Amino acid sequence: MEQREDHTKSSEPAFIPSKRTHQMRNIWAWGGPSSTTVNGSSDAVLFSSSLPSVLQFGKLPGKEREYNAQPKDDMFPMMKQPGTNARVADPMDDVAQHLIGNLLPDDEELLAGVIEDFDHVKLRTQVEESEEYDVFRNSGGMELDIDPLESITFGTAKASLVNGTGSSTNQYSIQNGAGTVTGEHPYGEHPSRTLFVRNINSNVEDSELRSLFEPFGDIRSMYTATKHRGFVMISYYDIRHARNAKTALQSKPLRRRKLDIHYSIPKENPSDKDMNQGTLVIFNLEPAVSNEELLQIFGAFGEVREIRETPHKRHHRFIEFYDVRAAESALRSLNKSDIAGKRVKLEPSRPGGARRSFIQHFNHEFEQDETKHNSFQIGSPSANSPPSLWSQLGSPTDENKLNALNETAFNGGMSPLGSNHLSGFSSGYPPMKSPVGKSSYWNNRADNIFHGSPTLHNSHSFPEHHGGIISASPLVSSAASSASTASGFTALTGTSFLWGNNNNLRDHGQPSSIQSQALSNSLFPNNQPQRQSNLYQNLRGSFGASEHFSQFNVGSAPSVFPFESNFGYFSDSPDTSYMRQGKFGGTGPTRVSGSLMTNFGAYPRINVASMQNGSVGFEGLLDRGRNQTVGNSGCQEDSRVQYQLDLEKIIAGKDTRTTLMIKNIPNKYTSNMLLEVIDETHEGTYDFFYLPIDFKNKCNVGYAFINMASPGYIVSFFKAFAGRKWEKFNSEKVVSLAYARIQGKAALVNHFQNSSLMNEDKRCRPMLFDPKHTENNNQILLNGIFISMAQQDATQERHDLPENPREDNFS
């Protein structure tokens, strides 16, 4: 017995006390302290709380308590005893394991108690809530892994459920504090010049990527160091090129992988020199300076995408260009220049800065209307998203009666007025106040337009929901687009200001004079309050005005994509008004100021005369909008028709336009090179020439403008150059000719005389010529600017426009 007692002491385990000490002590008390018991207790410990109370546990002897109280270095000291090669079997081990196995509850008994403790009603509710929360995943979306580099891909966004169901567009859930980002949610991805391309094969070559993305436009940079991680960054100069590339290449297979492309949002604190967004901020601007005047000044550097203001700060303006190179050129030329007697300061806008401030400002308002704004998304509008919400047509600082009208007259339903979507076109930016002469008349008279107008006597139904399709009255669209210019001008926000009016399809049907007069009198009575601008006059009577095909607008012919043109210029009388069709078939009155045309064609087109003929289903309007997409060849063709040269009409004298746009010019050509080519056959037939220059890259932008002295010269000019291949630089480009939007020498001079191009190198300025070969150079003074009438003789001597003698203009 003494030997066994000694052996027992040597085999007792020593361990550090822990919270499991009590459980282990109970097992040892039953089976006796042994190493086997300790090893076999792991299974029993899991169910120690389930052991019945019939087990009579004793107290450990005093020496065992000493072992428990004093920590040792080893759990099994017996294993270290010299000469011990095997464990000593304890006859009590088998007895302990057998009894414990019989006393433990079986599976049914164990799970029965667990199931009885559940509240089935609460469990079902939790499951339903979980399913609703997971609606994004159920709708076919995906979750993106958290990656610090990927956080720059998404802007701050807020998730929303559309009427309790998931949107059909892709949803992206991120966990960086920005919430859930919807692919085309108003708070989702904002159009950017940088594309974040995922799912890239690591073996793809850089040249292969460049050849894939470069056809859509000039690539600014390519970041391919992360190909091994499955993504790259492609940056364009022009945001339209990025948009077109994203639309065309989305899900395109590349080495058996479908590309996943998103817009990339710049970092929160970019460098002051980061011009990725192409937006400039003007400080200390005279509030009286209109957006039209700013457009004339900044439009000389490139196409302007948007001009917007900040609330309560009329002396600040944001000028956003499509092309960042134009923004850089404008910054260099106009910074610290004098505009309207004040020295202004230009700075690059912090990417998304103004946008974020408006998001915060309208956060609460958009939360309330979010379901309504998103319940009518159709298709994938990524290529057509304008940078402004369509639902906010007024100023953020003014009382917006338009939204109230949408909620009251239409009972909170979707309408062509309050809708922020037309056939799947979603929005990226919040509404930016952009008053091109903001009229207050709409705020006072909006309700009267749709309530009891004597001339609009036929019954027109308000929108009704039918299985997700909305019917609407044509009266609403036409009257709304007409009323938007009640006092002759209004704020151009949303698509009207950003995309302008496309002029590509005209409304030839004109109402009778009686109908026109009655309609204008009912909408715009004589006692209406007016706030006239010095650039505008009353619009009353403009509905009956005829279109003048002799004057076509904007400084360049339209691009292939119909959404790229913004503003129009022309040199006709300021009293001329137009009813034109917008890019989506929208009709809106157009007011003209000097050489500037602004338009309001944001709504589906309805002939003014046809407003008396009853309602038209909204499905037709949707079809019209869907038909005018980027990929629609018919729309592309229509956008070119009005600028195409028709030699038969020119010969017959029906088309008297004289200003041409020469396209597809190799970038290395200079003005002198181009003029030498022209003078080979047409010396002395033109009086204006201008080759726009990219000042950053020191090359031309690929097109030029020339004004022929007579329309008759266009026929021979077309025959000599159209389709001709350029001889120098081994270029594969061929000459393409089209009419320019600014027509006539006088309009061109008026457009460029106050341009900042006067501060650029003389070789980059527009040039005037005297086609009559006068012996001496003539100079004319226009608004304090001398313009040289260059001699055109056998020596080919030409003079650029001289520097501006008034140093206080743009110095």
UniProtKB/Swiss-Prot annotation:
GO biological process: positive regulation of meiotic nuclear division
GO molecular function per UniProt: RNA binding
Keywords assigned by UniProt, alphabetized: Repeat, RNA-binding
Domain of life: Eukaryota
SMART domains found in the cross-reference section: RRM
Entries under SUPFAM superfamilies matching the protein: RNA-binding domain, RBD
The keyword Repeat is annotated on this UniProt entry: yes
The keyword RNA-binding appears for this protein: yes
InterPro entries: MEI2-like_RRM1 (IPR034453), MEI2-like_RRM3 (IPR034454), Mei2-like_Rrm_C (IPR007201), Nucleotide-bd_a/b_plait_sf (IPR012677), RBD_domain_sf (IPR035979), RRM_dom (IPR000504)
Disordered as annotated region, ranges: 371-397
Matches recorded under Pfam families: RRM_1 (PF00076), RRM_2 (PF04059)
Domain RRM stretches: 193-266, 278-351
Biased composition (Polar residues): 374-397
PANTHER family, A to Z: RNA RECOGNITION MOTIF-CONTAINING (PTHR23189)
Stated role: Probable RNA-binding protein that may play a role in growth regulation.
Protein name (database record): Protein MEI2-like 5
Annotated organism of origin: Oryza sativa subsp. japonica (Rice)
